[in-house]
């Protein structure tokens, strides 16, 4: 599932590079449709929110999940287009997650002239379909990174305000540790 989805996405990005480069909305729509097929946004959002998710409504969780995904697409969508050559993914193996929460699928992103990059996908079965809820690139967890990044803003402002700021672009999901 992971290798097929990753290969499909990389191939489509390469084939439609000029279209996506001149039409960012088309790129966002494509990535959004792929995320909906393969990614468990709401569960990932609950993990990112951590204790802030307790007592939150499903609507607030969805609001945050969508805002975070939109922010990530705006920030990283064009980066995906700039991958040169013909990258591919190589499956290394899979293992069960603790507590029977799903599986960890270990892969490597292989690019000509570069060392392979380890990428792990944490997946769970949702109504008979395997969905990704966390991605670890070179040992760095997307969920843990964003949980750390958003903890203080969530404590200070709450889910709705942080989601609103993510959606407006005044706050971005990304590697910075201060929420901006």
Model-flagged regions — what are they?
Residues 64-66, 74-117, 169-180:
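Surface-exposed, charged secondary-structure patches
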Residues 116-144:
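Short beta-strand edge/turn micro-motifs at domain boundaries
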Residues 53, 70-71, 96-97, 110-111, ...:
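Solvent-exposed loop/turn segments at secondary-structure junctions
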Residues 134-180:
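Low-complexity, intrinsically disordered terminal/linker segments enriched in charged
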Residues 15-22, 26, 55-59, 86, ...:
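Surface-exposed, polar/charged faces of alpha-helical domains
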Residues 1-76:
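Early exported N-terminus immediately downstream of N-terminal targeting peptides
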Residues 14, 77-81, 135:
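Charged/polar positions within long, soluble alpha-helices
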Residues 36, 52-53, 81, 151, ...:
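Amphipathic alpha-helical interaction elements
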């Amino acid at each position: 599932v992971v290798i097929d989805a990753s290969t499909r996405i990389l191939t489509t990005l390469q084939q439609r590079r000029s279209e996506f480069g001149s039409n960012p909305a088309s790129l966002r729509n494509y990535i959004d449709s792929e995320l909906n097929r393969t990614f468990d946004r709401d569960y990932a959002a609950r993990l990112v929110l951590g204790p802030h998710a307790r007592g939150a409504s499903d609507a607030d969780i969805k609001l945050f999940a969508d805002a975070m995904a939109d922010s990530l697409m705006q920030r990283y969508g064009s980066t995906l287009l700039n991958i040169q050559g013909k990258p591919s993914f190589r499956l290394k193996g899979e293992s069960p997650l603790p507590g029977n929460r799903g599986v960890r699928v270990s892969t490597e992103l292989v690019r000509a002239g570069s060392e392979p990059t380890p990428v792990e996908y944490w997946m769970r079965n949702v109504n008979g379909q395997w969905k990704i809820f966390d991605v670890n690139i070179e040992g760095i967890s997307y969920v843990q990174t964003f949980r750390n990044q958003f903890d203080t803003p969530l404590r200070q402002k709450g889910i709705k305000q942080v989601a609103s700021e993510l959606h407006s672009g005044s706050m971005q999901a990304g590697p910075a540790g201060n929420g901006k």
